[in-house]
Design a protein with these regions (language model features):
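Membrane-embedded and interfacial regions of multi-pass energy-transducing membrane proteins
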Residues: 2-546
Length: 546
């Protein structure tokens, strides 16, 4: 009977409810739209990774023998723009937020299904402008578009890239609005705020940042394009403008944007750590509120990127102090995850390996961020490879590792197939080892004084650069492996079943892959979040059935 039931479910899941390209391109099913995003950002991830490998190959030798200096400027710019705006910012919210938020709260879809589809098309249009800029000579301003270089001196295609970033911003805003309204209005009966999965809390906080912060970036980028075309004199000091105004506006969005990339990963960690330690999350309320605190404090620390830009000493001291404060809610999360692991029944499936990697790498990134928040240290290492290493420990060690963790954890739910565990574990180890070999030497390089964005360097730095390039090669293999074995699993993987990990949460109470509208009947929630003691029968008074 069970086999027959699963067979029936397989005939009616969201993947085969309709066929043909048109059914995918016009779908309003949040799960299909999530897969459209997944396919898109995967392409951009490997495009950005290709630029990164060219950068590392250029830095193998002190003279920089691979490309010209102007080409090198374009490589690190295009790497940053593609990775940040076309992968990291949309990655978890657009893929797993889209796929999981409705199922986690017992809804049949997001609040605005057509707006959700429009968000993906807007993202693709914006990405098209950025790709056009790349194909017509590239961009050399750095991903930050700093003025007055971007508005006056750069000979690259700044306007097309700026329009691309502007357009993709609307996709981010619409995704955030959709998630906020869905969480407020479409929760299942009994699913109170204090019963919500921490994944939902993290995405809710992220969505608030998207809605409030992204318009500032959009306006700023449009001003850059207009100044470049019409010389309005907003940022150009020769025309009475103020280049520092651009930095204030840009970082007012771009520091909270760090949390757009990290907060969703933190939500993933809470789900995975609770599942594979078979425990309730320690200090649920504190972890939930820390997401809100990060969203609020993230808007108050933007000027710590500007300690050497000419802001007053008084302002630098204030923003330095606020930078120390913003580390507290992140530290609360790390402490509570660690406490959850204590005396847990821990198993080491692939998602848990990525969770451990996240905790270690993100902690390293966070601690070095506190160093950079201290003005005296920042003056010494700003614009060196110390900043590059810190940024990548947060963005890759946090954002990309969290994405891979989520991909492996929910892959059976998304596809109904299991991946080969041995290859997945090998990939996780290669990512961890390759990442540390790539970026830890860069802390040393930065402290020794090697500036970033230079295509040539003194011979004394070569050994550490060779180590970094070797690590990048290992990291590339670790990133390529999941694409291969996950694609293989679609055809040859074992059937997953509804809940292969015996996980808590409403998304595991429907078929794998889920049916069109997620649930045959609206679920009624009568239990607390992360009730693994009840699931495993270890709670006092709960009997194990069967």
């Amino acid at each position: 009977m069970e086999t027959a039931s699963h067979s029936t479910e397989a005939k009616t899941n969201y993947l085969n409810a309709d066929y043909g390209i048109k059914s995918w391109l016009l779908t309003t099913d949040h799960k299909r739209i999530a897969l459209l995003y997944l396919g898109s950002i995967t392409v951009f991830f490997f495009l950005g990774g290709f630029f990164a490998m060219l950068i590392r190959l250029e830095l193998l030798t002190p003279a920089g023998d691979l490309v010209l200096s102007d080409t090198y400027n374009k490589l690190f710019t295009m790497h940053g723009v593609v990775m940040i705006f076309l992968f990291l910012i949309p990655s978890i919210p657009a893929v797993f937020g889209n796929f999981l938020v409705p199922m986690m709260i017992g809804a049949k879809d997001l609040a605005f299904p057509k707006l959700n589809l429009a968000s993906w098309y807007i993202f693709i249009i914006g990405a098209g402008f950025i790709l056009y800029a790349i194909l017509t000579g590239g961009l050399d301003t750095g991903w930050t578009f700093y003025t007055p270089y971007s508005t006056t001196y750069s000979n690259s295609n700044v306007v097309a890239a700026a329009l691309g970033v502007f357009i993709t911003g609307f996709s981010s805003i619409f995704t955030g609005l959709n998630i906020i309204v869905t969480v407020h209005r479409m929760r299942a009966p009994g699913l109170t705020w204090r019963r919500l999965p921490l994944f939902i809390w993290a995405h809710y906080a992220t969505s608030v940042i998207m809605v409030l912060g992204t318009p500032v970036l959009a306006i700023t980028i449009v001003l850059v394009a207009l100044e470049r075309l019409f010389h309005f004199g907003i940022f150009d000091p020769r025309l009475g403008g103020d280049p520092l105004l651009f930095q204030h506006l840009f970082w007012f969005y771009s520091h909270p944007a760090v949390y757009i990339m990290i907060l969703p990963s933190m939500g993933v960690m809470s789900e995975v750590i609770a599942c594979f330690s078979r425990k309730r999350i320690f200090g649920y309320d504190f972890v939930a509120m820390s997401s809100v605190a990060i969203a609020v404090l993230g808007f108050l620390v933007w000027a710590h990127h500007m300690f050497v830009a000419g802001i007053s000493t008084y302002a630098a001291m204030i923003f330095s102090l606020l930078t120390f404060f913003v580390a507290i809610p992140s530290a609360v999360k790390v402490f509570n995850w660690t406490a959850t692991l204590y005396k847990g029944s821990i198993t080491f499936e692939t998602p848990m390996l990525y969770a451990f990697a996240f905790i270690g790498l993100f902690t390293m990134g966070g601690l070095t961020g506190v160093f950079l928040g201290a003005v005296a240290i920042d003056l010494h290492v700003t614009d060196t490879y110390f900043v590059v290493a810190h940024f990548h420990y947060v963005m890759v060690g946090g954002g990309v590792t969290g994405f891979l963790c989520a991909l492996h954890f929910w892959w059976p739910k998304m596809t109904g197939k299991m991946y080969p565990e041995a290859f997945a574990k090998l990939s996780a180890v290669l990512v961890f080892v390759g990442f540390n070999l790539t970026f830890f030497p860069q802390f040393v390089l930065g402290y020794m004084g090697m500036p970033r964005r230079y295509h040539a360097y003194p011979p004394e730095f070569q050994v550490l650069n060779v180590m970094s390039t070797a690590g990048a090669s290992i990291l590339a293999v670790g990133f390529l492996m999941p694409m291969i074995y996950l694609a293989w699993s679609l055809q040859y993987g074992k059937e997953a079943g509804p809940n292969p990990y015996r996980a808590a949460g409403l998304e595991w109470m429907t078929a794998s892959p889920p049916p069109d509208f997620n649930f045959d009947e609206t679920p009624v929630v009568t239990w607390e979040a992360y009730n693994y003691d009840e699931i495993d029968g270890t709670k006092k008074g709960v009997e194990v059935v069967g």
